């Protein structure tokens, strides 16, 4: 049975369904994320996230079976991302798919949400194991909203905060973001903060404050800001990246790679090696990248880079061994760096 995300969300929190396993898919990912955010608020520490591309078969089954074993006293919500990658690990063996279906069918005391980052086609929904999930669970779709509906949602958000936005300013904001709800959420929050006192937004103000995140923000901008020690902006960009569904481990992977290369370059420099040749030896051959890395080397001492590598290793260990939230660990790391810079600048200024 397929239902819309609006219908599902309305009933789930007032009259929880008997079904226990659901597939969430659709074009409006913001609506799915909004539901999952409310789900996390409801379940707190009993809200668990699994990444299909990271977890092994046995870890996956253990996680689901544990929710059944220990779920007697406290109901849990298990959210599974990158489910397609997990299915690839199972291969084409019929028995493995049957085992997976059996495990999902036997979830009785908790809720499992299989989340896709796009709208699934009929052919995909009619293939196993999703076909079986539809029979004993549910399919929830977040269809694309009309432009008028999106406009009304944005207007409602401003009105809730008592802010009057000029019509041409609103139209500009909608065009700038391409009516993308994920981008609009970020920009509306920013504009609400900006207009919190005077309670009005003009076209010029929206042009000055808002920008289209998806066109301007990427992982490399985050890495650039961090390595140049602009931690305040790095924090904002990190939140934007996560909001757009960038996996935190992808961010960690690129940042760790840069940190290791920079540390290696510092050591080679100390030994008297030519910097350009040293860069090429670690795979940096593009002139633009060379220029970037030179600015990073100037901004960071060898000790800075060593500490950065150790911090990233700690974040990696805590997230994998103790299942701590990688994003929160990154935020804490950036916040501590920012506080340290503020103290340093204050002491120098005094």
From Swiss-Prot:
Gene3D superfamilies: 1.10.8.60, 1.20.272.10, P-loop containing nucleotide triphosphate hydrolases. The keyword Nucleotidyltransferase applies. Signal peptide: none annotated. It catalyses: DNA(n) + a 2'-deoxyribonucleoside 5'-triphosphate = DNA(n+1) + diphosphate. Keywords: DNA replication, DNA-directed DNA polymerase, Nucleotidyltransferase, Transferase. The keyword Nucleotidyltransferase applies. One of its GO terms (molecular function) is DNA binding. Pfam families: DNA_pol3_delta_C. Its EC number is 2.7.7.7. GO terms for biological process: DNA-templated DNA replication. GO terms for cellular component: DNA polymerase III complex. It is an enzyme of class 2 (transferase). InterPro entries: DNA_pol3_clamp-load_cplx_C, DNA_pol3_delta-like_C, DNA_polIII_delta, P-loop_NTPase. Component of the DNA clamp loading complex consisting of tau(3):delta(1):delta'(1). The DNA polymerase III holoenzyme complex contains at least 10 different subunits organized into 3 functionally essential subassemblies: the Pol III core, the beta sliding clamp processivity factor and the clamp-loading complex. The Pol III core (subunits alpha, epsilon and theta) contains the polymerase and the 3'-5' exonuclease proofreading activities. The polymerase is tethered to the template via the dimeric beta sliding clamp processivity factor. Belongs to the DNA polymerase HolA subunit family. Part of the beta sliding clamp loading complex, which hydrolyzes ATP to load the beta clamp onto primed DNA to form the DNA replication pre-initiation complex. DNA polymerase III is a complex, multichain enzyme responsible for most of the replicative synthesis in bacteria. This DNA polymerase also exhibits 3'-5' exonuclease activity. The delta subunit is the wrench that will open the beta subunit dimer. NCBIfam families: holA. This is Probable DNA polymerase III subunit delta.
